[in-house]
Amino acid sequence: PEHPEDWVINYGYFITPSDVDISLDLMKQYGVKPEFECFAMTDLHYVRRLINKGWTDPTGGPNWVSFVYTTGSNWNLPEFMDMLKQVCPRNTLLNIIATGTQQFPILTEALIHGFNVRVGMEDNVYLGKGKKADSNAQLVEKVMQIAKLIERPIANCEQARAMLGLGAPRKFEWKD
């Protein structure tokens, strides 16, 4: 296609409550830490219900919840992020993901509010208006510069694993 936006496939994604139960049971069985991705407040309330009915993270660490701001979202950021802090389930580490042209302003607001952020080409391919990134590293570097400007500490790998309650990396063994 002539324009990158023509490459996007218009589709929907859904997961049923029984799919969630099966997935969570398998994660518990294998000690996998789930990431709950929320696209709306109703998703966050659903995660809270799962936690309140007794589902706990098999790693023993905090629940990892990502809230996704998509292109076209029109929330008033400071007030909305304040509300996220109030409605987040207990024992939760909140991560903000933003897509499209407003990624860096949204992630900056998230950092100011004390949230963790995700950045990468899965979510956005631009460093700024009309300037494409050549790599994920460029996007990470930009968000690191923003964090440094607002004096927000940046976790290294070991610190991030500790925050998530993951402990030391496990060695993968292929089983037939």
Question: Where are the language model's segments positioned?
Answer:
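C-terminal accessory extensions appended to soluble enzyme cores
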Residues: 158, 165-176
